[in-house]
Amino acid sequence: MQIVGILLLYDANFFLLYPRGIIVNGLLAVGIGGFIGAILRYGISEWMNTDTFPYGTLAINIFGSIMMGLLMMLLSREYISHEVGLLFCTGMIGSFTTMSAFSFETMNMWNQSQLQGILYAMVNMIICPIGAFLGWKIGTFMM
């Protein structure tokens, strides 16, 4: 394969070389998916979050975990292409769900009520991995 491009990441001492086309397809897939996921996240958060509880973020994290499990199962069995995986998993689900929002909201809830902060964190850390597992099982059942 002919190496046609160099991507500079982080600093001048770190270079990654990519074969022709891989970086363009991957970047476009992640970018388009990221745009869609970010828009969905914003809309759902605005619609569902309240002043007392971030219902939107919780719903996003649970649904995103289920979808990630389903999509990763499909990707692992090659029912979807690598580029489709980048579009949906890395791009859309990656920007749709976010650890930073979860962390910030947990901290805010902890400051209001330690019990509520602990419960919110525990629900996310227990339900979301279960959601990923369920998504995987749903995908297995569908195939």
Language-model features: where?
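Membrane-interface helix-loop junctions in multi-pass transporters/channels
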Residues: 2-143
